[in-house]
Amino acid sequence: MANEFRVCDDCKAPNLKTLIPRLKKLDPNATIKIGCQSYCGPGRKKTFAFVNNRPVSALTEDELIEKIAERLKKS
């Protein structure tokens, strides 16, 4: 089953210009959906992405990528 990443283009925390290429590097075959994820409260304070319908957040993009990589290893 292919992985799915969902990221928000409304929230201020995620920088899509840098985050999306890094997500593609983690899994080139994953589907990436961009749009509101209704995760506004945490999304204003932390960078986040949904990985296979589960939220993953961190204070920095580097930490987020590490957490996502760990999540993908567990799947």
From Swiss-Prot:
InterPro entries: DUF1450, UPF0741. Belongs to the UPF0741 family. This is UPF0741 protein GWCH70_3359. It comes from Geobacillus sp. (strain WCH70).
